[in-house]
């Protein structure tokens, strides 16, 4: 999958990118702002966006999710902002809570990929940090 990462914490963004690339995914980004995320989404064919909610300490990830939805790009919130994620569940496929186990990200993406393509998700266990909103 081609996955857009929108995360303003550099170490988290790099760790996330590394895990996904090692699993064979193409990483777009990471982007740390609304503008950078949307620019990358327009420049590349993105299959999925992983979005931190609290970009720049302002909740800008919700704005990114709204714009990506208009572009028909599915998003998953990756954040410690549980209440905000649930309040905006209509904008995302789901939520991966921080902190998370890095291996759970790869497994979560496999589950999300199956859901997006109408396939049977990989066998359990589904990562505890993943919550689907559908």
Task: Set out the residue ranges of the language-model regions.
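Conserved acidic carboxylate
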Residues: 7
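Two-component/phosphorelay signaling modules centered on CheY-like receiver
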Residues: 10-29
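Acidic, metal-coordinating helix/loop segments flanking the phosphotransfer/catalytic sites
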Residues: 30-48
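Conserved phosphotransfer microenvironments
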Residues: 52-69
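Hydrophobic/aromatic residues positioned on beta-strands within the core alpha/beta folds
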Residues: 76-78
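A Lys-centered signature of the CheY-like receiver
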Residues: 98
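Conserved two-component signaling phosphotransfer/partner-docking surface
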Residues: 101-106
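CheY-like receiver
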Residues: 116-134
